[in-house]
Amino acid sequence: MEKCFNIIPSLLLISLLIKSSNAAGIAVYWGQNGNEGSLQDACNTNNYQFVNIAFLSTFGNGQNPQINLAGHCDPSTNGCTKFSPEIQACQAKGIKVLLSLGGGAGSYSLNSAEEATTLANYLWNNFLGGTSTSRPLGDAVLDGIDFDIESGGQHYDELAKALNGFSQQKVYLSAAPQCPYPDAHLDSAIQTGLFDYVWVQFYNNPQCQYSNGNINNLVNAWNQWTSSQAKQVFLGVPASDAAAPSGGLIPADVLTSQVLPAIKTSPKYGGVMIWDRFNDAQSGYSNAIKGSV
């Protein structure tokens, strides 16, 4: 009989652990404004569960891959290795730190399956669990790779498969498609079912973003995204009007009182993604919403 009584708390513990591991969170992009503070500053807010370092903006088409962290550091002089201890400090707090590929203004493409494999090996050896004498962010081992691909679109499914194939480390994969479904650049990659997190950009796209009190277009697009192969879907929002020139800012009170209640019923709801750390630090957006995410 004693064993029977012990089963119930054990099951409760397992249930709590599962719920905790799938708990919703906030993701943020850091790296595109030298005035946004350090990476560790962002993590020390305790507002974020994911930080995407933006961006590896040059790769493919015979180019040497290169990160561009705006005014934070000069990669050509190994100046970005200073962030290694900050990455490790973030990870020690339980925050997943990923490297984001692409962006809105990069020089990147994948012209063949071979280029996809070559890039995967480069990422593994220079940012993930492999080894290299020239790791741009130092010895810190990142948790995964984010795909913010806003031009081209071929062979990113093969890149995802190659990154997923490194058995020595779980490589978390995330993607940041635009909200019109399916995404013009990342659809084939997302349909592999390999992406742990898909933070959809519900801004700069009038047909599927919040506008003038109307959440219907956003919710309709959200329902399309949650029917995709994504494991978890996040609502991507700008932290201010300045962060989204073509619109989509959802006032924090509207997000918490109207939008989140409408989308959190989905079992694929993962949380909220914020673009970006600089604008969030200025507006206090994550402070205003974190209790409701």
From Swiss-Prot:
Family (UniProt): Belongs to the glycosyl hydrolase 18 family. Chitinase class II subfamily.
Domain GH18, first and last residues per copy: 24-293
Organism: Cicer arietinum (Chickpea)
EC number: 3.2.1.14
One BP annotation, GO: chitin catabolic process
InterPro entries: Cts1-like, Glyco_hydro18_cat, Glyco_hydro_18_chit_AS, Glycoside_hydrolase_SF, Glycosyl_Hydrlase18_Chitinase
Disulfide bonds: 43-90, 73-80, 179-208
Highest rank taxon of the organism: Eukaryota
Active site: 150
A cellular component term, taken from the record's GO annotations: extracellular region
SUPFAM superfamilies xrefs: (Trans)glycosidases
Signal peptide: 1-22
Task performed by this protein: This protein functions as a defense against chitin containing fungal pathogens.
Gene Ontology molecular function, alphabetical: endochitinase activity
Reaction equation(s) it catalyzes: Random endo-hydrolysis of N-acetyl-beta-D-glucosaminide (1->4)-beta-linkages in chitin and chitodextrins
Name of the protein described by the UniProt record: Acidic endochitinase
Keyword terms of this UniProt record: Carbohydrate metabolism, Chitin degradation, Disulfide bond, Glycosidase, Hydrolase, Polysaccharide degradation, Secreted, Signal
Compartments in which it is found: Secreted, Extracellular space
UniProt cross-references to CDD domains, sorted A to Z: GH18_hevamine_XipI_class_III
